[in-house]
Regions:
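A generic structural signal for alpha->beta connector loops
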Residues: 76, 104-106, 155, 223-226
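S-adenosyl-L-methionine-dependent methyltransferase catalytic module, highlighting the catalytic core
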Residues: 13, 18, 22-24, 30-37, ...
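Conserved N-terminal segment of class I S-adenosyl-L-methionine
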Residues: 1-120, 126-130, 142-145, 231-232, ...
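A short His-aromatic
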Residues: 134-136
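C-terminal beta-strand of the catalytic ATP-binding
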Residues: 280-282
Length: 282
């Protein structure tokens, strides 16, 4: 692993990087997979959908705990990661150091900003942006996409995952799922999700929630040819340990998300919480 600690001289003002500290990374989605030495399904899916091969080069923007970096290296891919959080750099560096030499030597990490990529034109075959879009203000996000297009090779691909889906937060959750969860909690003595629509952390860092239409608009403006879809992760029944709990989970998805109708329009627009995109540079 090559550890390059730099500060971009062209950083754009955005969310304070100090908000992304050790406590933040221990609490966010997928942390339990990382603590168990596993790869979260989200990152496995991103790699599978990308079509990346081991002879390709990749950039991971906003690497966080370093989960995707390590997953790509295990596939034989030479990957560079950037993040502007100092804590992210330290967390990822420690995790990468525990990996076998043939994997960790394929990873480079850089302390840098997503809006001013410190790479030459046409440097990478693939760029991954998983759970970064919603953390960038609109001008930052457009600049980041412009930079991605610049450093991608011809026919290179940008793989994007962002959550939450703004329509889910504005309509699906508060108007249907949250009240339905409260009913199920009373009927079956469960502890289903009844959180605020947006937590304090969400309000601090999720400053640019997307819909499939708004994300498409950014990518079109940048000049990418893109495919955008809503992921089914959130609205598909989770596998449970016992038949009784599985039955309850299936009933919850039916009751709270209208499953399996939640997999198709217009229901998926309101209940699917994951937005994916693959954008290609001509």
């Amino acid at each position: 692993m090559e550890d390059i600690n730099k500060n971009s001289q062209q950083q754009t003002a955005g969310v304070d990087s100090r908000l992304y500290d050790q406590e933040y990374f221990e609490a966010i989605d997928g942390a339990h997979y990382s603590s168990e030495g596993k790869t979260a399904p989200k990152f496995i899916y991103a790699i599978q959908k990308s079509g990346i091969e081991k002879e390709n080069s990749a950039l991971d923007i906003g690497f966080g705990r370093g989960d995707l970096l390590m997953a790509l290296a295990k596939q034989g891919v030479d990957v560079t990661g950037i993040d502007y959080s100092q804590d992210a750099l330290e967390i990822a560096r420690k995790a990468i150091a525990k990996q076998p030499a043939e994997w960790k030597n394929k990873i480079k990490v850089l302390h840098s900003n997503a809006t001013a990529l410190e790479f030459s034109d046409q440097s990478f075959d693939y760029i991954f942006m998983t759970d970064l879009v919603e953390h960038l203000y609109p001008p930052e996000l457009q600049k980041c996409f412009d930079e991605c297009k610049r450093v991608l090779k011809p026919n290179g691909k940008l793989i994007v995952h962002t959550a939450p889906n703004r329509w889910y937060n504005d309509f699906g959750y508060p108007l249907w799922e949250q009240p339905m969860n409260r009913i199920l909690n009373k009927l079956f003595r469960q502890k289903l999700l009844t959180r605020p629509i947006r937590t304090e952390t969400d309000l601090n860092v999720h400053i640019n929630e997307q819909t499939i239409l708004s994300l498409k608009k950014y990518l079109v403006k940048t000049g990418f040819k893109s495919k955008i879809w809503l992921g089914s992760e959130y609205v598909t029944p989770i596998k449970k340990d016992s038949p009784g709990m599985q039955l309850l989970e299936n009933f919850r998805q039916l009751f709270c998300h209208a499953y399996p109708l939640s997999l198709i329009p217009p229901f998926n627009l309101l209940f699917c919480n994951d937005i994916w995109a693959i954008a290609k540079k001509d």
